[in-house]
Every structure is written in structure tokens, then in C-alpha cells.
Design a protein with these regions (language model features):
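Non-catalytic DNA-recognition/assembly elements of restriction-modification systems
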Residues: 125-149
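Periplasmic-binding protein-like
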Residues: 44-46, 248-253
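A short beta-sheet element
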Residues: 1-39, 53, 183-190, 194-248, ...
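Intrinsic, low-complexity N-terminal interaction/targeting segments
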Residues: 44-61, 66-70, 257-262, 267-270
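DNA target-recognition patches
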Residues: 14, 22, 142, 147-179, ...
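Amphipathic alpha-helical segments with low aromatic content
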Residues: 67, 73-134, 282-285
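Short coil/turn segments at secondary-structure boundaries
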Residues: 49-51, 151-159, 254-256
Length: 286
């Protein structure tokens, strides 16, 4: 419900009329502690309950003034608490920058270590590998999994997060989206893959992820589940990395029904998905 920002200096700034500006009562609370406490889940829940409006909900200045907060009477304790969380925020920022750098490095390496623009040779290769990559159909190396959870072998509902992979639905959404009866869902085993046809920011053609975190789980039949036909010929980790690239996007774009998107869900059949091209090196290079 909105956000809280603390002015970092004594310069003057211009704010929109939808922004509430306020100062502290210095003998009751420190600026840093107030900035910290206003970002807590408890205060967020209070503000959410007081919010009004349609799509863009907001909290009035009058409502904001009624929010109760708990504060230590000792000003030194307030400063120490604020200092701890400020330090944590700083560490989060540093790690986020490292993550961003590594993410960009991975993206650049994926671009250069997989063939592109019809070539059978990637721009960067490991020493000792010079052979052309082989063009195959995805369906040549994987097979569809349509195993149902008929005997209720698993009660763990999964969802596909483009960022985190196949994860527990309850943990991810903080809620159970799947129906209580999951006997008609697909039963997915560790090491198998699933294609989520839903588009999202950064994933315009959905996402393909492998089940790594759990031994088994269940997925809605809206997803396309598949496994590798021959593990001795196709490396599972290679396929995982391949689907982190955009090399398969063109194949999906060519086969998805033109303009057919139902609330962000691509209209592509399993047969068409398995018909997309994939380029493979030797098993050793994979």
C-alpha cells in the first residue's frame, strides 16, 4: 500500500498532491525509526485496511494520522533499531547489485554459447569442440508426460515461477490456488520439465522449468509436462539452460495461434510445442 521514503538531505523538493509529507515530533520519535516502523508488515496491514479507491487505492492524510504504532520510549533504542535495519537494507542493495551483474553476465554468455541466426556454431565454445551442432525437433529428445495423480500420490500443488522454477503453490502465493481434489492433476516427478504457457514480464513466451526442489508434486493440466527420452544422450542440465535462452521463442511464436492469447495464456498445443527446433552439440559438450 504505497511506499515510504525519507528525504536524505536538506534540499527542497516538489511532491505531487497524492504524496503525504510529514515530519516527526523530535522528543517522541526519531526520523530513522519512524521510517523503519512505517515499512513493517503490521503498519502495511493497517494502511491496507484504511485504503480507499478503485484500481489505484490510496490512504488519506486523515486516515494515516489514525494509524497506531508501538515505539520504545528510549530514543537510543529507537536509533539502534533503525541502524540495524538500515545496515540490512544496505547489504540487500549490495547483494542486489552483485545479482544484477551476475544475471547480466549469464545473459551475455547464453547469447554467445548457443548458436543463433541459423548458424550451427556458437560464438564461444570450450576448448576441443569444433563440430557443428545438430538441428533436431524437441519431440525427438523428449516425451510428453500425462501421468495423472489418480492415487493421490502427492498433495503438493506446484506452480511455475519464471524466476524460481517449479515451486510450492502455497508458499509462492501464500495461498492454495489449486482445487482440493488434485487427483486429476498431472503427477510430476523430480527431474521432469513443465511448460507454463502464461506470459509475464521478461517471459513473453512463457517459461519451461525442471522440478528440482521436491521429489514429486502436482500440476494443472493446463501445463505441458515432459521428460527426456534418453538421459545418456541428452543432458538434463543442458536442456534446463537451453530453456533459459530465447532460442526456442521463435518456434513458439511461429506455432502459437496468431493473436490468440487468453488472459496472457499462449494458444499452442503440445504437438506444436514439441515440433519446435532445438540445436544440440555432442553429449560431452552438453
Amino acid at each position: 500500500m504505497g511506499n515510504v521514503a525519507q528525504i536524505p538531505d536538506n534540499r527542497r523538493y516538489i511532491l505531487s498532491q497524492r504524496t503525504i509529507a510529514f515530519d516527526v515530533t523530535p522528543d517522541l520519535i526519531t526520523e530513522n525509526f519512524l521510517a523503519t516502523v512505517l515499512r513493517t508488515p503490521t503498519v502495511f496491514a493497517s494502511l491496507t485496511a484504511l485504503s480507499s479507491g478503485g484500481t489505484a487505492k490510496g490512504v488519506s492524510q486523515k486516515s494515516l494520522a489514525t494509524v497506531d504504532i508501538a515505539i520504545p520510549a528510549n530514543m537510543n533504542e529507537q536509533e539502534q533499531l533503525a541502524s540495524i535495519f538500515s545496515g540490512i537494507d544496505h547489504l540487500i542493495t549490495l547483494h542486489q547489485r552483485k545479482y544484477d551483474k551476475l544475471f547480466n553476465l549469464k545473459k551475455a554468455m547464453l547469447e554467445k554459447m548457443f548458436p543463433q541466426n541459423g548458424s550451427l556454431y556458437p560464438e564461444i565454445r570450450f576448448k576441443g569442440f569444433t563440430d557443428a551442432w545438430e538441428q533436431r525437433k524437441l519431440g525427438d529428445i523428449v516425451e510428453r508426460v500425462v501421468r495423472k495423480n489418480t492415487n493421490n500420490e502427492s498433495s503438493l500443488p506446484l506452480t511455475i515461477s519464471a524466476q524460481y522454477g517449479l515451486v510450492d503453490q502455497i508458499t509462492y502465493f501464500n495461498n492454495r490456488v489449486a482445487s482440493r481434489d488434485v487427483s486429476n492433476y498431472y503427477l510430476v516427478l523430480n527431474g521432469e520439465f513443465a511448460y507454463n504457457k502464461s506470459t509475464s514480464d521478461g517471459f513473453p513466451f512463457g517459461a519451461v522449468k525442471r522440478l528440482d526442489l521436491y521429489e514429486k508434486g502436482v500440476l494443472s493440466t493446463l501445463y505441458i509436462v515432459f521428460s527426456i527420452r534418453n538421459q545418456s544422450k541428452t543432458d538434463s542440465d543442458f536442456l534446463t539452460v537451453f530453456f533459459d535462452t530465447d532460442r526456442w521463442h521463435k518456434g513458439v511464436a511461429e506455432r502459437a495461434a496468431e493473436g490468440a492469447r487468453n488472459h496472457g495464456l499462449l494458444n499452442i498445443s503440445a504437438d506444436d510445442f514439441f515440433d519446435i527446433d532445438i540445436f544440440l552439440p555432442s553429449h560431452r559438450e552438453e
